[in-house]
C-alpha cells in the first residue's frame, strides 16, 4: 500500500498520475483478498432500487484503494434504470443510486457530468459550495446539480465524450453515426461509416463505442459491417469491427462484440465483450492481444494510473447470445466493476452486484472526488441553490437569517 500512498502524494503535488508503482507490493497486498471468499465485504447502499432488493459485495481492499487514490466511480445501468456513485465510506463501499430512464453513455470530469439515455441528454455541473450543506455535514466533497436537458428523440445513445472545444460527441446507435447537438435540432450528424448508404434509424451496424485521441474523435467500434436493418445480428459472435474515424477505414475485423475503445498511455485498448476480455490493439499489424479475461460481458472502462476499472454484465438472454465464446467459457456470468492491473492483467479487486443490477454500460473514474453527490431534479435543495457568474456575486445581498438560523 505504500506505493499507493506515494501515488496519492504525487497526484496531489503535481496533478499527474505516476506511471510507475511497485507491482510486487500492489499484487502482494491485494491478491490474498480475492482468494478468501469469507473476506468479501457487503456494500452499503443508498436510494436502492425498489422493485428488486439490491445486494452487492466487494473485496475488502477497495475502500482503502479508493481513499488513497482520492477517487470515486460513476456507473450507469440501463437495465436497472440507475446511475450509481461508488464511494469509499470507511471500511465499505457505498453504492448510491439515482433514477434515470435507461441511462447509458457518461461524460464526466471534475466540473461536469453528462448522462445519455435512449432519447435524452441530462447535463449536470459540480457546485462544490453545495456539498457542505448535504447531510451528514462534512462528508461530501462534490455535488452535481442538474442544469438542463436536451431531447434527441429515440436515437439509442451509447458512448459520449467532450472534445477540446467542449463540444459533446455522441454515438448515435439507431442512426449509426457520430453526432453533436445544437439548440435547434434533435441532433447534428457529423460522421458515419462509409459502408452505410443512408442515414436511417435502423441500427444497421450497431455503432457503439468512441475513443478520443488528442481531444478529437478517432476510433469507433461497431458490431457489424452491415448496411441493412439490424444486419449486424446475423454475425454478432465475431462480426465486430474497429474503425479509424479520420480515414473512415476499418482497422480490425473479426472482433466478438467490441465495445469501449480507449486511447490510454499511448495504446489503444478495447473490450471484446463476447470474449469477456480486455485487449490492446496493434494498429500497424492490425491485430489485438488479450490482456485479461474476466467473468462477465465486458463493457464500460476507465483508467487511473496502472489500473483499469471495467464494467461486467451477466448477459442472461441466451437466445440472443448463445453462440458467444464467453458463454462457452462460463456457465454463469458476473455483474459488477472489476479492477485490473493493466501491466499484468491481474485482478486487483472487484465490486460484484448479486441482485438488482444485471447489466453495466458505462464506468468512469471521478478523480479528486472521494464522496460526491448527484441531486435529482425534484430535490428541494435546487429551489435554493443559485449559481451566478463571479462578476454578479459582488452585488448579491443575502436576506438576514431567521431566529432558527435559516435565511429568511
Model-derived features: positions:
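Beta-rich, blade/repeat-based domains predominating
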Residues: 56-68, 99-111, 150-167, 196-218, ...
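Short, conserved, GDST-rich strand-edge loop motifs in beta-rich repeat architectures
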Residues: 58-70, 122-134, 220-237, 311-332
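Conserved beta-strand positions in repeat-built beta-propeller and related beta-rich domains
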Residues: 75-78, 114-119, 162, 168-175, ...
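Blade-loop segments of beta-propeller domains
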Residues: 92-159
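Beta-propeller blade signature
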Residues: 236-246, 326-343
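Loop/turn-rich, solvent-exposed surfaces of beta-rich toroidal or solenoidal domains
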Residues: 257-283, 287-339
Amino acid at each position: 500500500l505504500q506505493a499507493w500512498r506515494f501515488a496519492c502524494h504525487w497526484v496531489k503535488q503535481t496533478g499527474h498520475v505516476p506511471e510507475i508503482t511497485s507491482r510486487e507490493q500492489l499484487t502482494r497486498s491485494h491478491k490474498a483478498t480475492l482468494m478468501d471468499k469469507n473476506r468479501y465485504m457487503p456494500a452499503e447502499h443508498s436510494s436502492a432500487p425498489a422493485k428488486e432488493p439490491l445486494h452487492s459485495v466487494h473485496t475488502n481492499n477497495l475502500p482503502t484503494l479508493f481513499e488513497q487514490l482520492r477517487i470515486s466511480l460513476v456507473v450507469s445501468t440501463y437495465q436497472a434504470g440507475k446511475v450509481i456513485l461508488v464511494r469509499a465510506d470507511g471500511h465499505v463501499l457505498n453504492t448510491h443510486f439515482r433514477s434515470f430512464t435507461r441511462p447509458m453513455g457518461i461524460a464526466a470530469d471534475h466540473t461536469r457530468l453528462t448522462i445519455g439515455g435512449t432519447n435524452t441528454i441530462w447535463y449536470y455541473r459540480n457546485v462544490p459550495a453545495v456539498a457542505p450543506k448535504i447531510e451528514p455535514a462534512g462528508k461530501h466533497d462534490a455535488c452535481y446539480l442538474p442544469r438542463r436537458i436536451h431531447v434527441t428523440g429515440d436515437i439509442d445513445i451509447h458512448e459520449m465524450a467532450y472534445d477540446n472545444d467542449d463540444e459533446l460527441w455522441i454515438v448515435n446507435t439507431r442512426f449509426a453515426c457520430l453526432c453533436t447537438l445544437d439548440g435547434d435540432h434533435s441532433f447534428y450528424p457529423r460522421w458515419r461509416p462509409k459502408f452505410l448508404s443512408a442515414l436511417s434509424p435502423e441500427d444497421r451496424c450497431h455503432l457503439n463505442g468512441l475513443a478520443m485521441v488528442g481531444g478529437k474523435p478517432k476510433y469507433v467500434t461497431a458490431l457489424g459491417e452491415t448496411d441493412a436493418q439490424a444486419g449486424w445480428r446475423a454475425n454478432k459472435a465475431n462480426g465486430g469491427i474497429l474503425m479509424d474515424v479520420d480515414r473512415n477505414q476499418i482497422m480490425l475485423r473479426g472482433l466478438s462484440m467490441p465495445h469501449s475503445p480507449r486511447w490510454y498511455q499511448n495504446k489503444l485498448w478495447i473490450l471484446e465483450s463476447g470474449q469477456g476480455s480486455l485487449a490492446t490493439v496493434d494498429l500497424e499489424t492490425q491485430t489485438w492481444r488479450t490482456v485479461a479475461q474476466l467473468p462477465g460481458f465486458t463493457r464500460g472502462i476507465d483508467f487511473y494510473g496502472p489500473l483499469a476499472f471495467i464494467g461486467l454484465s451477466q448477459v442472461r438472454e441466451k437466445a440472443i447470445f448463445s453462440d458467444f465464446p464467453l458463454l462457452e467459457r462460463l456457465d454463469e456470468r458476473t455483474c459488477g466493476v472489476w479492477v485490473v492491473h493493466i501491466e499484468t492483467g491481474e485482478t486487483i479487486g472487484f465490486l460484484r452486484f448479486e441482485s438488482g443490477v444485471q447489466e453495466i454500460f458505462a464506468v468512469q473514474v471521478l478523480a479528486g472526488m472521494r464522496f460526491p453527490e448527484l441531486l435529482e431534479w425534484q430535490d428541494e435543495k435546487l429551489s435554493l441553490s443559485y449559481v451566478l457568474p463571479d462578476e454578479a456575486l459582488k452585488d448579491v445581498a443575502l436576506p438576514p437569517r431567521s431566529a432558527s438560523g435559516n435565511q429568511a
